[in-house]
Amino acid sequence: MPKRGKRYLEAAKLIDRSKAYAVQEAIELVKKTNVAKFDATVEVAFRLGVDPKKADQQIRGAVVLPHGTGKVRRVLVLAKGEKAKEAEAAGADYVGDTDYINKIQQGWFEFDVIVATPDMMGEVGKIGRILGPKGLMPNPKTGTVTFDVAKAVNEIKAGKVEYRVDKAGNIHVPIGKVSFDTEKLVENFATIYETILKVKPAAAKGTYVKNVTVASTMGPGVKVDPSTVAVAN
């Protein structure tokens, strides 16, 4: 257990660990208990009743948050010809093909997301061992392997976030910055929560959403009562 600083311990006193808070109150507490001296990221963590070892209980995808994450993401598009032109017009930060694959092989990583057209995936596969461990490998499930490169770039720039269940059955997703209005964070939270409910694997048994927590970077976690979240039917 890491040693906590004085500011963290003081902030943690404001939170009742035995209580699950209404989502708005939880987010207000996260803002109040932020101990970072910068505009910290607010993250939601879901503990799910799934067995990620089973192929039919894997959860992975992406969703556009209505208010973005507050982070500018640099997009590399691997495409040729007309698709490369479309990516440039859409505002991709870098556009190319094997030239950028060679750069990545040499240790270049000045980007946050890769979008690739399906015809480029044979080449991209050559650097799979480099991209995979960093979570940068393009994937059709997250909309990053597509011929509609303009749409992919626009969605990423608009605040698209990826989610993926880890080995312990948890999903962590950023929903904005502590400087965001509470309402915007609540709406971003509701969007990702609604998405997680929609992608419940048919094979999952028992309670699906076991626990939901929100926290800021370096701040204490606050338990959320999911029943207080307004979810569209």
Swiss-Prot record:
- One protein family per Pfam: Ribosomal_L1
- Annotated coiled-coil positions are none
Looking at the record's lineage, which domain of life comes first? Bacteria
Give Gene Ontology CC terms.
large ribosomal subunit
Keyword list (alphabetical) reads: Repressor, Ribonucleoprotein, Ribosomal protein, RNA-binding, rRNA-binding, Translation regulation, tRNA-binding
One GO term in the molecular function aspect is:
tRNA binding
**Subunit structure, interactors included:** Part of the 50S ribosomal subunit.
> Can you tell me which family this protein belongs to?
Belongs to the universal ribosomal protein uL1 family.
Sum up the protein's function in the record's words: Binds directly to 23S rRNA. The L1 stalk is quite mobile in the ribosome, and is involved in E site tRNA release. Protein L1 is also a translational repressor protein, it controls the translation of the L11 operon by binding to its mRNA.
Q: What is this protein called?
A: Large ribosomal subunit protein uL1
Source organism of the structure = Anoxybacillus flavithermus (strain DSM 21510 / WK1)
Its taxonomic path starts at: Bacteria, Bacillati, Bacillota, Bacilli, Bacillales
